[in-house]
Regions:
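Non-catalytic, solvent-exposed segments at the cell envelope interface
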Residues: 1-261
Length: 261
């Protein structure tokens, strides 16, 4: 039996260069208790795909959104109701549509990758980011000299979570949501692949607006790194699933989760 008014949405940011899903966040929207909780799934998490051990971001590469959602659902023991995949151009367009975002860049960023034609140069501190700037900030892993977050992908996920919260705040501000709904719809049609209708999205936006941006929170699935994979912690992951993500009335058990060791 499912809880009423509770939905799970897998949000994926696609890497245009390698065809994989670079960012995966499972979002629970609880319209009854009034909260939104997003959990980042490290892209190097170990998963079994086609009977072989792989990194989870390979699932999109192999079978698109459907296989990615099935893999996440199998691992966490809960259904993925909806999927939203956005490519890099869509991310940039959305940030520009809301007039850019003021964001506290967490560290000095100094990175160049001539192969990807990517240069990332920002000073630590609050600054106004355009769509192109924002994309550079959320893609950053480490500096040219190897310094940076200390834990590349985990540090990057924390920055992405903070940035998404800043975007939600700006998108849901009364001025933006009312005057820019047509802009949002165009961006969704052009750059976003989803099984949500525009009506679904508008309804969800209204529900989140009622909750307020302070009811949006994020964390990362509890994990440990052991080359070449990130391993999800079964006990802590189960607790997190039951606390925030589980759409069922009954708690999930250890048997419901399938986390490769």
């Amino acid at each position: 039996e499912r809880k009423g008014g509770f939905y799970t949405i897998l949000l994926s940011g696609l890497d245009d260069d390698n065809g994989g899903s670079d960012t995966n966040i499972l979002v629970a929207v609880d319209t009854v208790n009034g909260y939104v909780y997003g959990v980042s799934i490290p892209r190097d998490s170990k998963a079994i795909i086609d009977g072989k051990a792989r990194k989870i971001n390979y699932a999109y590469n192999k079978g698109g959104t459907e296989l990615l959602a099935d893999t996440v659902s199998e691992q966490l023991g809960i259904p993925v109701d909806y999927t939203v995949s956005v490519n890099l151009k869509g991310f940039t367009a959305l940030v520009d549509a809301i007039g850019g975002v003021d964001f506290d860049v967490p560290i000095n960023m100094d990175y160049d990758d001539p192969i990807q034609n990517l240069s990332i140069h920002f000073k630590k501190g609050v600054q106004h980011l355009s769509g192109a700037d924002a994309l550079r900030v959320v893609r950053f892993r480490h500096n040219n000299d190897g310094s940076g977050y200390g834990s590349e992908d985990l540090g990057r996920m924390a920055t992405q979570q903070k940035f998404l919260k800043a975007v939600a705040k700006k998108m849901l501000s009364a001025g933006n949501i009312l005057t820019k709904i047509d802009d949002y719809a165009k961006i969704f049609n052009q750059y976003v692949d989803t099984n949500l209708t525009v009506g679904n999205l508008a309804w969800l936006g209204t529900e989140v607006l009622k909750m307020g941006v302070d009811k949006i929170d994020f964390s990362t699935l509890p994990n440990a790194w052991k080359y070449p994979y990130i391993y999800l912690d079964p006990t802590e992951t189960l607790t997190l699933v039951n606390t925030y993500l589980n759409p069922y009335v009954e708690d999930r058990t250890a048997e419901d989760l399938h986390l490769p060791s």
